[in-house]
């Protein structure tokens, strides 16, 4: 994550500044989910937030930085939720299942965030035209999932397998579950997650 630096160049932010940034990020999520990435201009986001475009420019250097902060904040909220659910789980099998179910639980209650993430991941580009997000930005996630699978192998709960392959498959399965749910909102997301957890439990034993 980027350094916490105010537009003035001073480190740290006041409570009011943090609240304003949160307001802008929340408005950005709504506009992106409703209108799509291309139509989510800073002017529209400012209008949704009930502020001037200049206020956004004070807190963010431009649309790209705001989009990156949306991703940072959403992923932080997911991680916070999952960590609470996984706290105290004593087995690798339990951690595996809890990870899948807790991520699902969080996103079920935050569908708008999920739609916004999908738009950003599909459209945000770096200055040289390359996708900002993708497999190349998933390393931290893969390593955290590998830790669960490695723990299971060390404890004897899981059979031997390539933990990187399993981590990639695990992540992809969750991503595709959510992608299907966005297109088919009546799909039973919780049932899908339970089936997925069952599938991975069988795959590692």
Name these PLM-found stretches:
Residues 1-19:
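N-terminal intrinsically disordered/low-complexity leader segments
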Residues 20-29, 45, 66, 70-74, ...:
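Generic hydrophobic, amphipathic alpha-helix propensity
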Residues 23, 31-65, 69:
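Helix-turn-helix
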Residues 24-32, 103, 200:
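Short hydrophobic clusters on alpha-helical segments that form packing/core surfaces
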Residues 69, 83-113, 166-170, 193:
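Hydrophobic alpha-helical connector segments
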Residues 94, 132-138, 153-169, 190-191:
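All-alpha amphipathic helical-bundle segments outside canonical DNA-binding/catalytic cores
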Residues 104-147, 154:
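Short secondary-structure transition hinges
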Residues 105-109, 147, 151-154, 160, ...:
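Amphipathic C-terminal alpha-helical segment
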């Amino acid at each position: 994550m980027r350094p916490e630096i105010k537009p003035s160049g001073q480190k740290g932010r006041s409570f009011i500044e943090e609240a304003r940034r949160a307001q802008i990020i929340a408005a950005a999520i709504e506009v992106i989910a409703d209108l799509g990435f291309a139509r989510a201009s800073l002017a529209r986001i400012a209008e949704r937030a009930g502020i001037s475009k200049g206020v956004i420019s004070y807190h963010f250097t431009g649309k790209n930085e705001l989009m990156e902060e949306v991703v940072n904040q959403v992923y932080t909220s997911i991680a916070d939720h999952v960590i609470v659910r996984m706290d105290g789980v004593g087995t690798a099998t339990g951690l595996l299942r809890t990870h899948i179910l807790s991520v699902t639980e969080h996103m079920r209650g935050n569908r708008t965030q999920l739609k916004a993430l999908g738009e950003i991941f599909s459209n945000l580009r770096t200055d040289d035209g390359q996708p900002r997000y993708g497999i190349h930005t998933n390393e931290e996630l893969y390593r955290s999932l590998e830790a669960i699978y490695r723990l299971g192998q060390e404890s004897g709960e899981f059979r031997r397998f390539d933990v990187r392959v399993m981590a990639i498959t695990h992540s992809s399965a969750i991503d595709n579950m959510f992608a299907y749910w966005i297109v088919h909102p009546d799909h039973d997301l919780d049932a899908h997650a339970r089936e997925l957890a069952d599938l991975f439990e069988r795959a590692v034993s």
